Structure formats: C-alpha cells, structure tokens
Curated annotation (Swiss-Prot):
HAMAP family referenced in this protein's UniProt entry, alphabetically: Upp_A
Naturally occurring in which organism (per UniProt): Metallosphaera sedula (strain ATCC 51363 / DSM 5348 / JCM 9185 / NBRC 15509 / TH2)
Cofactor: Mg(2+)
Pfam families: UPRTase
Name of the protein this chain belongs to: Uracil phosphoribosyltransferase
List of residues binding 5-phospho-alpha-D-ribose 1-diphosphate: R80, R105, D139, P140, M141, I142, A143, T144, A145, S146, T147, D208
Lineage: Archaea, Thermoproteota, Thermoprotei, Sulfolobales, Sulfolobaceae
InterPro entries: PRibTrfase_dom, PRTase-like, Upp_A, Ura_phspho_trans
GO BP term, pick one: uracil salvage
Activity modulation: Allosterically activated by GTP.
Length: 215
C-alpha cells in the first residue's frame, strides 16, 4: 500500500479555502470539483504507460506516452459527499464507468474518539468490471474509515486489477486501519489530519463535506 500525500501549493491553496468556515456552499462545491480534477491527474501519473512513436504533421517521428488504463477506470461515488469530487475525477477520466454507493453513518457523541462507526448502506449499483479494470473509490473524508472498510469489502470481491482511494482529508487512524486489512490499496489524499473528535469528525478537518456542498 502506498499513501500519496498531495501537499503541493495549489492543492493546499484549495484545501485552505475548503477548511475556512467563511467559504460558502457554492465555492465549497467548486473547490471540491477542482481538487477532484487535480487528484485525478495525480492518479493518472501513477498508472502504467507505454512509450510510443507517432508521426507529426511535419512528417517527423516523435516519441510519446500512452497511458494504458485510461479506458479501464471505474469510479465509485460514495453518496452524497463525494459527488463534487467525482465530478472533478470524471474530468480527468472522461471514459470512466461510475458506480454509486449510498452510505450513511450513525453519528453520536461519545466520551472518547470512536474507533468504529455504525454504517448503513441503503443502495449500491456498481457496473460490471473485469480483472483489467482499476477501481477508484472517492470519499472526501476518511475519519474512522468505517464507511471505506465496508465499501472496500464489496469492491475487493469484484477483483479489479487495482483499488485506489481518492480523498481530500484522511486521519492517521483511518489510514492505518485500511493499511492493516487492505495492504494493496493505494490512497491519494491532500492532507493527513492527526485527530478524530468525540463525534467521529476529523480534526481540524473541514466539517461535514456533504452538508457544506449541498446544505
């Protein structure tokens, strides 16, 4: 398992806007879309490719690159929070198939940060994939990773060639939890935040990504 921390200035500039309580719903959603596109480009940079030769309009041969798996991508949208993130990912992978999972966690305040949250999955529709496909699971926030672990269990049964998680913020605990059970899964995230509060939210985080995107 590899964790790709996307802490370049442009990523962090957008993330700063998303963290800011003063950022309104429209700008928050636009920021999520922008990050989705940028994360998609970073994922594409880590896909297999071939070196090829093409002939330019000047009749000259030029060396080029063809990324192998751009037509073998399936993106899983964890509703509803991931929808703007997926919109951006689809700009990077316009030929991608898309699956959806409607998942919600039961939130309650406890005396200490929870290590597990009760997750209800009310709907799932994932297209048929082959062993040549790459599954990208999009979820902007990975706190206790309870939702992600449920979805990883379902997607891994489909036996794609590779599973990638696209997130904006992940907790240290959530990454460790995923790594222990799914060591072959790669995670792309903009920030790794240190804490989870008593309600299961990442701290400092950015609040509830679904509520901030859609109200």
């Amino acid at each position: 398992m590899a964790v790709f921390l996307l802490d370049k200035p442009l990523f962090l500039h957008i993330l700063t806007q998303l963290r800011d309580i003063k950022t309104d719903q429209i700008m928050f959603r636009k920021g999520m879309v922008r990050l989705g596109r940028l994360i998609g480009y970073e994922i594409a940079n880590h896909l297999d490719f071939d070196i090829v030769k093409v002939v330019t309009p000047l009749g000259v041969e030029a060396k080029g690159v063809v990324i192998k798996d751009l037509d073998n991508i399936m993106i899983v949208n964890v509703l509803r929070a991931a929808t703007p993130l997926v919109e951006g990912l689809l700009k990077a992978f316009p030929a991608a198939k898309q699956g959806v999972v409607a998942a919600s966690r039961r939130e309650m305040e406890s005396s200490s940060p929870p290590t597990e949250m009760e997750v209800e999955i009310t709907y799932m529709k994932i297209p048929k994939i082959s062993k040549n496909d790459i599954a990208i699971i999009a979820d902007p926030m990975i706190a206790t990773a309870s939702t992600m672990m449920r979805i990883l269990g379902m997607v891994s049964q489909l036996q794609p060639k590779r599973i990638i998680i696209a997130s904006v913020i992940a907790s240290e605990y959530g990454i460790t939890k995923i790594r222990n059970k799914y060591p072959d899964v790669d995670i792309f995230t903009v920030s790794i935040d240190p804490e989870i509060n008593n309600r299961g939210y990442i701290v400092p985080g950015l609040g509830d990504a679904g509520d901030r995107s859609f109200g």
